[in-house]
Amino acid sequence: MKAQELREKSVEELNTELLNLLREQFNLRMQAASGQLQQTHLLKQVRRNVARVKTLLTEKAGV
């Protein structure tokens, strides 16, 4: 997910995206814990995407 794509989204869309990413992160962690996750790089990607969305939400809030 590119930062430019995220910058074009509204705050509501970013919040929805954040919830989806957190759900995905939870599912990936459960798969990793049970030994089912083959593509471990996805954990890192999702974690960084969560950080990107949170950063943009903070920027848009003007804090």
UniProtKB/Swiss-Prot annotation:
GO terms for cellular component: cytosolic large ribosomal subunit. Keywords: Ribonucleoprotein, Ribosomal protein. The keyword Ribonucleoprotein applies. InterPro entries: Ribosomal_protein_uL29, Ribosomal_uL29, Ribosomal_uL29_CS, Ribosomal_uL29_sf. GO terms for biological process: translation. SUPFAM superfamilies: Ribosomal protein L29 (L29p). It holds the Pfam family Ribosomal_L29. One of its GO terms (molecular function) is structural constituent of ribosome. HAMAP family: Ribosomal_uL29. Belongs to the universal ribosomal protein uL29 family. This is Large ribosomal subunit protein uL29. The gene is rpmC.
